[in-house]
Design a protein with these regions (language model features):
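Extracellular glycan-interaction patches encoded by glycine-rich segments
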Residues: 1-3
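Extracellular receptor-binding modules and their adjoining Ser/Thr/Gly/Asp/Asn-rich linkers
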Residues: 6-142
Length: 142
């Protein structure tokens, strides 16, 4: 393929990527920084996750996805949302490696020992003992 010619199918035995998440482009109500936790809703498809344990959580804004779906979307504000894989995420509170992560409001995630069904964003890949910061998590429905 090229910028003017596209192929519909790729046949390969294996492929590799420098980055580690699969993401999709959604229309957002504003621009969001990488690591922001977002939910379905607002005036467009995606908005910042504003409530704790949000059951409408969609994922985390990705900085550099290895594979990007729906890249042809044209919108005033495009949100590249990590759907699965490793992604840096804004967190608040103490986090233990392996903890299930849910929305904490204000675009952050937090650890939860007993999350409600449909609220888990992913699992923490590292410990964190600060008030707020960025850690790597594995995004995906657990």
């Amino acid at each position: 393929g090229s910028t003017s010619s596209y192929f519909n199918q790729i046949f390969a035995q294996a492929t590799t990527a420098l980055y580690a998440d699969l993401a999709e482009v959604y229309e957002a109500d504003t621009d969001y920084a990488p690591g922001t936790v977002v939910s379905f809703g607002g005036s467009k498809e995606i908005t910042v996750s504003a409530t704790e344990g949000d059951p409408t959580v969609a994922g985390v804004i990705s900085a550099n996805p290895s594979y990007l779906m729906n890249n042809g979307l044209t919108a005033d504000h495009r949100a590249i949302v990590a759907l699965t894989g490793r992604v840096h995420t804004s967190v608040t509170g103490a986090v233990t490696k392996g903890a299930m992560m849910i929305s904490a409001g204000h675009g952050h995630a937090r650890a939860s020992a007993a999350p409600a069904m449909g609220t888990v964003i992913g699992k923490a890949l590292e410990n964190f003992d600060g008030e707020s910061g960025i850690i790597e998590i594995v995004v995906g429905r657990m």
